[in-house]
């Protein structure tokens, strides 16, 4: 079903069964599959392919040669009807690829709201992106990677399968991330190592001086005290009881499966 207010260029192909919302713009030479839903106000510039069981929210901008919902690159994939879900107000730039999930990974690749995926970024099967993340040019997320909110991944950086990247993390360009990155941390290198707290990012997002100081103290306990992770955990939990902004560290420790960058 195509809403009467939507525009579909004469050279675009929209397969029967696709749901195209109000004021959607589908530019020249785009291809939209039968099991695709595109929300109100979203724009496909030109030469965009949206395939598979894919749901795209409102007011997204998707640029030339992006490919969304295509068959993933997991050799175990056998054609199951797995999905891609994309939220609202995302900017997906030229040649970005977002692959559908796998049965083994829960069947869903999910992108939240207000994200920017720059040219040639790749989001593999079963990845989860939160809100307001940035993937710079040629950033690559392997399968099952999870990014919390406000994560920045620098250009030409690769993130290993199953890694978890905490909120407000900034990973520098040309890095290789092979383990989990706790929230608020700046990381860089191959393999990525911690380089301090993302203070500028926290200031821009309205964190108070007191909150930033507490986060820095938690970082020092984790990385500068000489303590093992197991020794640092209870002290960070005690700090979180006094400063709620530190709680994401505690929550992150419970989620981490690949170990923390050191």
Curated annotation (Swiss-Prot):
Cross-referenced Pfam families: Acetyltransf_11, Hexapep
Q: Molecular function terms in GO for this entry? A: acyl-[acyl-carrier-protein]-UDP-N-acetylglucosamine O-acyltransferase activity
Name the InterPro entries for this protein. Acetyltransf_C, Acetyltransf_C_sf, Hexapep, Hexapep_transf_CS, Lipid_A_LpxA, Trimer_LpxA-like_sf
Q: Which domain of life is it from?
A: Bacteria
Q: What is its EC number?
A: 2.3.1.129
PROSITE patterns named in the record:
HEXAPEP_TRANSFERASES
Q: Where in the cell is it found?
A: Cytoplasm
Q: Which UniProt keywords apply?
A: Acyltransferase, Cytoplasm, Lipid A biosynthesis, Lipid biosynthesis, Lipid metabolism, Repeat, Transferase
Is-annotated flag, keyword Glycoprotein? no
What does the record give as the reaction this protein catalyses? a (3R)-hydroxyacyl-[ACP] + UDP-N-acetyl-alpha-D-glucosamine = a UDP-3-O-[(3R)-3-hydroxyacyl]-N-acetyl-alpha-D-glucosamine + holo-[ACP]
Q: Name one GO cellular component term.
A: membrane
- Methyltransferase in keyword set: no
Q: Name one GO biological process term.
A: lipid A biosynthetic process
Record pathway? Glycolipid biosynthesis; lipid IV(A) biosynthesis; lipid IV(A) from (3R)-3-hydroxytetradecanoyl-[acyl-carrier-protein] and UDP-N-acetyl-alpha-D-glucosamine: step 1/6
Predominant cellular place of this UniProt entry's protein: cytoplasm
Briefly, what is this protein's role? Answer: Involved in the biosynthesis of lipid A, a phosphorylated glycolipid that anchors the lipopolysaccharide to the outer membrane of the cell.
Which family does the UniProt entry place this protein in?
Answer: Belongs to the transferase hexapeptide repeat family. LpxA subfamily.
Q: How does it assemble?
A: Homotrimer.
What is this protein's name? Acyl-[acyl-carrier-protein]--UDP-N-acetylglucosamine O-acyltransferase
Q: Which organism is it from?
A: Klebsiella pneumoniae subsp. pneumoniae (strain ATCC 700721 / MGH 78578)
């Amino acid at each position: 079903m195509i809403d009467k207010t939507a525009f579909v260029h004469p050279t675009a192909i929209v397969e029967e069964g696709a749901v195209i919302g109000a004021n959607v713009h589908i530019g020249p030479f785009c291809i939209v599959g039968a099991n695709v839903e595109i929300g109100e106000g979203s724009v496909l510039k030109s030469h965009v392919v949206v395939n598979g069981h894919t749901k795209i929210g409102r007011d997204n901008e998707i640029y030339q040669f992006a490919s969304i919902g295509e068959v993933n690159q997991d050799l175990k994939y056998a054609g199951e009807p797995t999905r891609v879900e994309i939220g609202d107000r995302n900017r997906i730039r030229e040649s970005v690829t977002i692959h559908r999930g796998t049965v083994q990974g829960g069947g869903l690749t999910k992108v939240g709201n207000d994200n920017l995926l720059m040219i040639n970024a790749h989001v593999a099967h079963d990845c989860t992106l939160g809100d307001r993340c940035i993937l710079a040019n040629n950033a690559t997320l392997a399968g099952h990677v999870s990014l919390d909110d406000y994560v920045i991944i620098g250009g030409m950086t690769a993130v290993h399968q199953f890694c978890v990247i905490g909120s407000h993390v900034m990973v520098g360009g040309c890095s290789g991330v092979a383990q989990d990155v706790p929230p608020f941390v700046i990381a860089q290198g191959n393999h990525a190592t911690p380089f301090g707290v993302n203070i500028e990012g926290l200031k821009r997002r309205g964190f108070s001086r007191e909150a930033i100081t507490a986060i820095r103290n938690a970082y020092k306990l984790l990385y500068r005290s000489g303590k093992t992770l197991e020794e640092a955990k209870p002290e960070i939990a005690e700090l979180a009881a006094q400063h709620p902004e530190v709680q994401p560290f505690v929550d992150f420790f419970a989620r981490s499966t690949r170990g923390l960058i050191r």
